[in-house]
């Protein structure tokens, strides 16, 4: 058997999630470094020692270009899915979490839980992803392991169980004590690849025993049997501790906590052991749920090669050498290269010409994939992020990945004629990779408009256009993606009748529209309440299409209409003259008429802004926020810094980076993410409508 195909219980699909500066990349690099060395040292006799790809003497960062990397540790295969730490890219995190089975959450031991870590943690909660925590940077000034662990309780309401205790901290950080084995672990070689277990130093013995006691107490709370043994004062074995911890981690009832300093090459190997000990294999999780294409019935697919093939596309990348790479996670069945696969989301079959596994340093072509595998396919032309790939004989649709709607737009235009064609190709490639980037051409002005999740998101897109695709573009002022909605219900009638020689046109619709409350999370709902066949059922899709078309431009300022329920109450038809087109036009007329009566209002995107600043600038920053229609929601102290959390309209935030820099002499930083849409105050709405 090839080393690649391990049994399912020996497979781990994990992500590494973290706040931007917690040291996620370094932790990932070290994992690839040690697993690479370990794997290849072990396999010399198989003749695959082609591995001097990481020059030991040079500390060079492997930034994982790939969305998924595979590595081996002690006979287990670990697939690592890359998740970015910046909030403008929450969509990337969402899609990675969908296909993960577990995660390592990396924290900076000097800060514990930081604002972005909360966002990512909540997303992981949404998908019930089991986690272990790694307190990194134990060698940094201000590192405090137990303070950092406490923030998991206060900020994330998690149940952390430290299974290690640090030996020293800051510049005296030397290693860790394993509280399960009660051994001290020291790293001996400079590159951290050699480490040894020793007895716990005498001066730390007492504290270690106290910390072990705390750990056992928490573990006893998770399991009746262990509780009895614990209360009786009986010895609890290493196997029992790990069994209970594993079960609790997989059920999201506990988070084992480890510590180390990735940059100083300490703590990584025990972290890999913890991935194997506590995080789930595909067999530990419930089967994936989907909907049968033929009748919408719920079906489940088990991680079994004999089940029909089912996979989810979670990322598309354009590789300069092999073209479009479609990354997917296999949930059930088996797929051979060169065979056909059915994309049930698009309703098309495609041929997968090659299948590759990504290693940190190379691509490995494989003949087939099985359940639990994370691979990239070549030759899939229509497949996009969120699509389901399956067996054409048993089509199924997995839950789609929900991406937030873009909130900000920019006009981009090519500088020269030569750039024009390149721009179209480049934007097509980028929007395939990133589902939160939308591209459209403005009908009236002919401008190309790109829309995304924030200023930074679009800056990066423009930067990539220049750097990767060599397209020079001019960029317009950022524009806010306003929306329109209604505040009350209204009814209206639409009649479209044309009598000109030959066949006429006849469509007649009576509609009611009503507001959908924001908490329902729906932008549109269509209900047919007609009775007695006043309008034949076959015209209903045309009526819905007419309404949707009318919703593209609202009555106030031509912005898209959201949060509206349209109910068809009545109408009439003509045996000969009625057609789909006539009903589409009549429905559109009725909707536009009803909108005018339903008290239409403008909505604007509100952003959540988190600013971290030295205390002396706080007053100026807050008074500036007040001038931007912001609502300050909380102020907290983190070390010697203040954290301000506020909600502020997107339209008031353009260029905020520069403003904040000058207010704080470059010492404050901020992160911003979309929060919700809210009604624009009347005075401001009037100005916006005037401009349009």
Swiss-Prot record:
Residues annotated for GTP binding in this entry: 18-25, 82-86, 136-139
Subcellular location: Cytoplasm
Keyword GTP-binding: yes
SUPFAM superfamilies: EF-G C-terminal domain-like, P-loop containing nucleoside triphosphate hydrolases, Ribosomal protein S5 domain 2-like, Translation proteins
GO BP, sorted A to Z: ribosome disassembly
MF-aspect GO terms: GTP binding; GTPase activity; translation elongation factor activity
tr-type G domain residues: 9-283
Family matches, as InterPro entries: EF-G-like_DII, EFG_II, EFG_III, EFG_III/V, EFG_IV, EFG_V, EFG_V-like, G_TR_CS
A GO term from the CC aspect: cytoplasm
Similarity-based family: Belongs to the TRAFAC class translation factor GTPase superfamily. Classic translation factor GTPase family. EF-G/EF-2 subfamily.
Protein task: Catalyzes the GTP-dependent ribosomal translocation step during translation elongation. During this step, the ribosome changes from the pre-translocational (PRE) to the post-translocational (POST) state as the newly formed A-site-bound peptidyl-tRNA and P-site-bound deacylated tRNA move to the P and E sites, respectively. Catalyzes the coordinated movement of the two tRNA molecules, the mRNA and conformational changes in the ribosome.
NCBIfam families: EF-G, PRK12740.1-3, PRK12740.1-5, PRK13351.1-1, small_GTP
Protein name (Swiss-Prot/TrEMBL): Elongation factor G
Lineage, highest ranks first: Bacteria, Thermotogati, Thermotogota, Thermotogae, Thermotogales
């Amino acid at each position: 058997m090839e080393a690649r195909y391990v049994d399912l219980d020996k497979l781990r699909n994990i992500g590494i999630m973290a706040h931007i500066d917690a040291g996620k990349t370094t932790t990932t690099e070290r994992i690839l470094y040690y697993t690479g060395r370990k794997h290849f040292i072990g396999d010399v006799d198989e003749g695959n020692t082609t591995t001097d790809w990481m020059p030991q003497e040079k500390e060079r960062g492997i930034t994982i270009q790939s969305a998924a990397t595979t590595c081996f540790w002690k006979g287990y295969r670990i697939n690592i899915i890359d998740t970015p730490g910046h909030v403008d890219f929450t969509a990337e995190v969402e899609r990675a979490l969908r296909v993960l089975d577990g995660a390592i959450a990396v924290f900076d031991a000097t800060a514990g839980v930081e604002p972005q870590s909360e966002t990512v943690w909540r997303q992981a909660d949404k998908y019930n992803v089991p986690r272990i925590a790694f307190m990194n940077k134990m060698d940094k000034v201000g590192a405090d392991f137990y303070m950092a662990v406490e923030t998991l309780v206060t900020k994330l309401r998690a149940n952390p169980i430290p299974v290690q205790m640090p030996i020293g901290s800051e510049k005296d950080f030397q290693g860790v004590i394993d509280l399960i084995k009660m051994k001290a672990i020291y790293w001996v070689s400079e590159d951290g690849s050699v480490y040894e277990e020793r007895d716990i130093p005498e001066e730390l013995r007492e504290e270690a025993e106290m910390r072990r006691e705390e750990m056992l107490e928490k573990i006893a709370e998770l399991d009746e049997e262990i509780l009895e043994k614990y209360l009786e004062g009986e010895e609890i074995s290493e196997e029992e501790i790990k069994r209970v911890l594993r079960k609790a981690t997989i059920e999201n009832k506990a988070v084992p906590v480890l510590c180390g300093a990735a940059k100083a090459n300490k703590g990584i190997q025990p972290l890999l052991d913890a991935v194997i000990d506590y995080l789930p294999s595909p067999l530990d999780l419930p089967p994936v749920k989907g909907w049968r294409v033929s009748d919408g019935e719920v079906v489940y697919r088990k991680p079994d090669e004999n089940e029909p093939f089912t996979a989810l596309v979670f990322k598309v990348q354009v590789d300069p050498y092999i073209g479009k790479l479609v990354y997917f996670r296999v949930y059930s069945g088996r797929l051979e290269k060169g065979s056909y696969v059915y994309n049930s989301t698009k309703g098309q079959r495609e041929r997968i010409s090659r299948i590759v596994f990504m290693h940190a340093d190379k691509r490995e072509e494989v003949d087939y994939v099985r359940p639990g595998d994370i691979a990239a396919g070549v030759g899939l032309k229509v497949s996009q992020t969120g699509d389901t790939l399956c067996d054409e004989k048993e089509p199924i649709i997995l839950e789609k990945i929900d991406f937030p709607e873009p909130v900000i737009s920019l006009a981009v235009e090519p500088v020269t004629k030569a750039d024009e064609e390149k721009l179209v190709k480049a934007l097509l490639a980028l929007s395939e990779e990133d589902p939160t980037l939308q591209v459209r051409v403005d009908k009236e002005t002919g401008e190309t408009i790109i829309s995304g999740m924030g200023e930074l998101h679009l800056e990066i897109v423009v930067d990539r256009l220049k750097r990767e695709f060599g397209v020079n573009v001019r960029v317009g002022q950022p524009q806010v993606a306003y929306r329109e909605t209604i505040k009350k219900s209204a009814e209206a009638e639409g009649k479209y009748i044309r009598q000109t020689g030959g066949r006429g046109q006849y469509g007649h619709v009576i509609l009611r529209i009503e507001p959908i409350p924001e908490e329902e999370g729906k932008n549109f709902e269509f209900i047919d309440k007609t009775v007695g066949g006043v309008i034949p059922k076959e015209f209903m899709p045309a009526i819905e299409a007419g309404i949707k078309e009318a919703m593209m431009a609202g009555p106030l300022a031509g912005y898209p209409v959201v949060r509206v329920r349209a109910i068809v109450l009545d109408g009439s038809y003509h045996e000969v003259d009625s057609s789909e087109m006539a009903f589409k036009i009549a429905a559109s007329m009725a909707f536009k008429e009803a909108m005018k009566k339903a008290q239409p209002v403008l909505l604007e995107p509100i952003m959540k802004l988190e600013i971290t600043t030295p205390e002396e600038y706080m007053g100026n920053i807050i008074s500036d926020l007040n001038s931007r229609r912001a609502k300050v929601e909380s102020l907290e102290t983190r070390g010697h810094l203040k954290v301000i959390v506020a909600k502020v309209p997107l339209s008031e935030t353009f260029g905020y980076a520069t403003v904040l820099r000058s207010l704080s002499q470059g010492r404050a930083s901020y992160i911003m993410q979309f929060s919700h849409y809210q009604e624009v105050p009347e005075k401001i709405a009037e100005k916006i409508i005037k401009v349009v």
